[in-house]
Amino acid sequence: MANVVVIGAQWGDEGKGKITDLLSRSADVVVRYQGGVNAGHTIVVDDKVLKLHLIPSGILYKNKTCLIGSGTVVDPKILLKEIDMLIDNEIDISGLKLSSTSHVTMPYHRILDEAMEADRGSNKIGTTGRGIGPTYADKSQRNGIRVRDLLNKERLRDVIEIPLREKNGLLEKIYGIKPLKTEDIVEEYLDYGERLSKHVVDCTRTIHSASKNKKNILFEGAQGTLLDLDHGTYPFVTSSNPISGGACIGAGVGPTLIDRVIGVAKAYTTRVGEGPFPTELQGSINDQLCDRGSEFGTTTGRRRRCGWFDGVIGKYAVSVNGLDCLAVTKLDVLDELDEIQVCIAYDLDGERIDYFPTNSDDLKKCKPIFKKLKGWQCSTANCRNLSDLPQNAMNYLRFLAELMEVPIAIVSLGANRDQTIVIEDPIHGPKRALLR
């Protein structure tokens, strides 16, 4: 038995969906432990492109328990759309489970998210406008609505009274928006609750039962390390904890239950929205990476900012997550480049530093110090073994592993499942040196 956490080692969009889908074959239970519909992952199966925001990637395999954990925030309207999409594609959803204590994104959360972001003007943080931040804020203020509340009319009417009164006051007096009606929301969300009721479970009990029965559990994070509320580039972060420690809180398990942590990183770096980005590129190479990598957000459709691989944030991700190994994705996007650069340190006010400054003002001043490597200028899309890779591609991967001081277990060379080199299965394989 092995319990594995999959995290993003950059600013999200690293390709965690594909890696989680790949590892789900060896897992019995797949748990999404934080975030909401602000995250998105794309999986390509038999030329079918499936885009999911809440449902764990393991749903595409039969006989898997796929659990949306207590640390998530759930927009039931979008969740039901995902369920319908999967049913339309003849995918069995009987293994889908939803924590009764997950908090629910309500209509006023989405409206407030958009209004607050617009009000920030030039100081906007780049929110997706899906209501995630306001939902987590209500959770922290003990003013939130949980999935269990959608299963009882009187309960829902009771718990919604205070937050709706507060939110209507904000909508009317601050933003000049028409207030929402209690009955409209209650009826709509009771309907959602009824449709979702057969999936609702006690999250912690479900996971601990699986663990007791020696099942393999895969914990799936959303977003990435640099978007972590406490350890990311604050305030340009998400409202939850995507790092590996967040799996324990969001799923309701102790750290001793985690056997291994795998980080997912692109062979270059991307970021969506606002905030400092030391290795960001401009011009033709930026456009080339964006176009070849299809760098447009699954959730928002926004064009992603592209840059060279940043080893400083990579080493930071290794540290704060306790990474055991790494999955490098989109290596094929670099195929046509004759020269590739990797950031090995920063220049901060004339001083060379090799650590990640968590102060966004300092990070904004950091200038990348690069190491140049030779490109391979040939396609890697059909490589299925390390021996198939061009020598310079191998050199590049080894350099990343040495720089980050963590072995590489998986290399992804395209969107399809089979466009992958699995050096070692992090769930069933022994802990040993992989590609260094």
Curated annotation (Swiss-Prot):
It comes from Prochlorococcus marinus (strain MIT 9312). Its main location: cytoplasm. Homodimer. The active site is at 13 (proton acceptor), 41 (proton donor). GO terms for molecular function: adenylosuccinate synthase activity; GTP binding; magnesium ion binding. GO terms for biological process: 'de novo' AMP biosynthetic process; IMP metabolic process. This is Adenylosuccinate synthetase. IMP binds at residues 13-16, 38-41, 128, 142, 223, 238, 302. It comes from the Bacteria. Gene3D superfamilies: Adenylosuccinate Synthetase, subunit A, domain 1, Adenylosuccinate Synthetase, subunit A, domain 2, Adenylosuccinate Synthetase, subunit A, domain 3. Belongs to the adenylosuccinate synthetase family.
